[in-house]
């Protein structure tokens, strides 16, 4: 583990090593995940694909996309011929998407219900963790249950609409919405104009925090 983190820390400072690491991540480290019937953690994508079985082409929005195929809810749709928008606050994840899923629009940004400068909490200085969050209470809960320590870093956080505007994303409506952003899920969902975008299916993480009511 320490050797992997040491190499990654070097790769982040060298363009050639960084590119090598990206391809290592896709074709060696996670090769076993490429050829699967389901890419989701709990076979969510099988249900999603069946739900849209009569729709050959469509559009998805994946907020907190993490990886282009490993534990991913939209890769089956991408293989089917769909495309869409993937958003993640970690640049390395978006670079992986740009290599593996060039047919998508991939954006590096943190998302919440307000435009602001805030802190991101990264467990054990591990930039590949799925438990990175902008919510201190979420980080504290993870720390309590998994004994992880966190580093704190200031970043720019944007609303979904602000991202669409700033990156000039051509998105009038979409069919499928997935949100998994470690504690901010319901805030972001409530901030998206669902009447405008009209998704027919929404997948959101049932987090460890008490959920807000969605109306």
Task: Briefly describe each language-model feature range.
Residues 2-215:
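Phosphate/nucleotide-binding beta-alpha loop and adjacent structural elements of enzyme active sites
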């Amino acid at each position: 583990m320490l050797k992997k983190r040491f190499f990654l820390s070097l790769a982040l400072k060298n363009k050639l090593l960084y590119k090598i690491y990206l391809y290592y991540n896709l074709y060696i480290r996670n090769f076993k995940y490429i050829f699967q019937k389901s890419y989701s953690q709990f076979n969510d994508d099988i249900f999603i694909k069946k739900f849209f079985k009569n729709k050959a082409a469509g559009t998805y929005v994946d907020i907190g996309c993490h990886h282009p195929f490993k534990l991913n809810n939209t890769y089956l749709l991408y293989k089917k011929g769909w495309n869409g928008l993937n958003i993640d606050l970690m640049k390395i994840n978006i670079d992986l998407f740009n290599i593996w899923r060039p047919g998508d629009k991939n954006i590096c940004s943190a998302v919440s219900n307000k435009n602001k400068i805030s802190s991101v909490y990264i467990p054990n200085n591990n930039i590949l963790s799925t438990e990175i969050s902008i919510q201190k209470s979420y980080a504290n809960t993870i720390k309590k249950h998994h004994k992880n320590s966190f580093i704190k870093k200031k970043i720019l956080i944007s609303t979904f609409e602000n991202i669409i505007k700033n990156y000039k994303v051509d998105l009038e409506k979409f069919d499928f919405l997935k949100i998994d952003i470690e504690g901010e899920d319901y805030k972001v969902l409530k901030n998206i104009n669902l009447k405008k975008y009209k998704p027919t299916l929404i997948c959101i993480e049932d987090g460890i925090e008490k959920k807000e009511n969605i109306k």
